[in-house]
Amino acid sequence: MVDMGGLDNLIANTAYLQARKTSDADSKELQRRRRSLMLPGPQSCEQLRQAMPADFNSLCEQQPIGRRLFRDFLATVPAYQEAMGFLEEVQSWELAEEGPAKGSTLQALVATCAVAPNPGQPHSFLSPALVTKCQAATTDEERASLVEQAKAEAMAFLQDQPFREFLVSPFYDKFLQWKVFEMQPVSDKYFEEFRVLGKGGFGEVCAVQVKNTGKMYACKKLDKKRLKKKSGEKMALSEKEILEKVSSPFVVSLAYAFESKSHLCLVMSLMNGGDLKFHIYSVGERGLDMNRVIFYSAQMTCGVLHLHSLGIVYRDLKPENVLLDDLGNCRLSDLGLAVQIQDGKPVTQRAGTNGYMAPEILMEKASYSYPVDWFAMGCSIYEMVAGRTPFKDYKEKISKEDLKQRTLKEEVRFQHQSFTEEAKDICRLFLAKTPEQRLGSREKSDDPRKHHFFKTINFPRLEAGLVDPPFVPDPSVVYAKDVDEIEDFSEVRGVEFDDKDKQFFQRFATGAVPIAWQEEIIETGLFEELNDPNRPAGCGEGNSSRSGVCLLL
């Protein structure tokens, strides 16, 4: 007899894997769609030009297309290009691995600052006083300090006249055209949907592909009726707004937020490598090799620090919520329980996952803040090493109350042979019962990245994506449950929507998220394609009398 469930799963996986392989703009259908696209005409950008704040950091640093076009503009003026080139050399030096070569680069940078490009004329972006200091520098400590000063002067130079000239240049006009293109309405017709990857309390997560770029994403589909029936609107909007605010290589990115007739949809980074819980318990022996534990812990720490810097407490850090991408880098996911700290006030609502919640959450009167995430970090590191959580053995049956009492009263024990002294120490510090004694929150400058557990990690290089992961997922494997193992939801009946609901849906469905969308446009080659002046006739910029955005869906 034919196993129809197995056949359905095979078909779903095959289509999904094929889509992943062809997401690089090589399909004929994708090329056909792209030929129908064009940027809006310049006249359609005038309203946006008046409304767009002249914010250098946003326009020229944070937004990928703005950053790209600003650098293209700088390349047209030698003095501006020189300043930009110097900043790029400084960044290369900052990210270089320690050693003699880095010291030589430092000396070369200071020598560049000390020698004027033309006899008797200092660099246009450096003050004469700084040039003189560079000429007199004799120690590496002096040189490093002078390079920092030169970096600040070069950046201040670019933010002045070059930025003002950029704002009245054709390069900025092109940026505005891309911004109008970015603001087009988004619906479910924008995507091709593939297999379901999992289910949650309010809906499902499935793989989707953007029809016009080929980019693959994960789409979290929240059932509108289920949200209303369970009063989940506030949580859904909170997750969306927090994801929108975060731009970190260590936290999943939100690319689109839209609504269909039946769902609110969050389109996020597709992490093909599975979650850390799967790798801890379902691949080989329980637990992970120490080099993987250190690498993932370092990236998780960076992710938590990024959230905290934005005033966000994660509240649900655990291996199940840490996902691997194609290359083996990890990101924090599922920010449904994340909360924004308001005016420094502690959180009093109990939330989290049993076994990972800090003692202060479990108290009779909960009152807590950022330190709860460091406690969960300790639980997660322990679990990656030992293949069990600190206060409950693998597959042990225990009540929530007993687990709570263990968390509140018992000291952590390290019986697994894989624990190194550094691993034991960082777990003890993260698992301190009181927030004031916990690593990451003992004082304002308490940085977990400085712990000797991370002595092999170069954090600036890690944040720049220059450290190779110790494990790369198999691209031919689908790290998700079989489709027939994922339960279907029963239909929600008797729920009707009123005007207030419709207003909420519109507030949620804001379309493309600028940074993630612009990264997609550049990464998939659409930026170069639509900017190509030699593009065939009929595939150029839009007619100025129309919106100019032509989409074939």
Swiss-Prot record:
Function recorded in the entry: Retina-specific kinase involved in the shutoff of the photoresponse and adaptation to changing light conditions via cone opsin phosphorylation, including rhodopsin (RHO).
UniProt organism field: Sus scrofa
Catalytic reaction equation(s): L-threonyl-[rhodopsin] + ATP = O-phospho-L-threonyl-[rhodopsin] + ADP + H(+); L-seryl-[rhodopsin] + ATP = O-phospho-L-seryl-[rhodopsin] + ADP + H(+)
Protein family membership: Belongs to the protein kinase superfamily. AGC Ser/Thr protein kinase family. GPRK subfamily.
All residue ranges annotated as the RGS domain in the record: 56-176
Key words of the record: ATP-binding, Kinase, Lipoprotein, Membrane, Methylation, Nucleotide-binding, Phosphoprotein, Prenylation, Sensory transduction, Serine/threonine-protein kinase, Transferase, Vision
Domain Protein kinase stretches: 191-454
Modified residue annotations for Cysteine methyl ester: C550
Active site (catalytic residues): D316
Disulfide cross-links: none
Oligomer status and interactors: Interacts (when prenylated) with PDE6D; this promotes release from membranes.
SMART domains: RGS, S_TKc
Biological processes per GO annotation: regulation of signal transduction; signal transduction; visual perception
Topological relation to the membrane, as annotated: Lipid-anchor
PROSITE patterns: AGC_KINASE_CTER (PS51285), PROTEIN_KINASE_ATP (PS00107), PROTEIN_KINASE_DOM (PS50011), PROTEIN_KINASE_ST (PS00108), RGS (PS50132)
AGC-kinase C-terminal domain ranges (all copies): 455-520
GO MF term (any one): ATP binding
Record comment: activity regulation: Inhibited by phosphorylation of Ser-36.
Propeptide: 551-553
Gene designation: GRK7
EC identifiers of the protein: 2.7.11.14
UniProt-recorded name of the protein: Rhodopsin kinase GRK7
CDD domains, alphabetized: STKc_GRK7
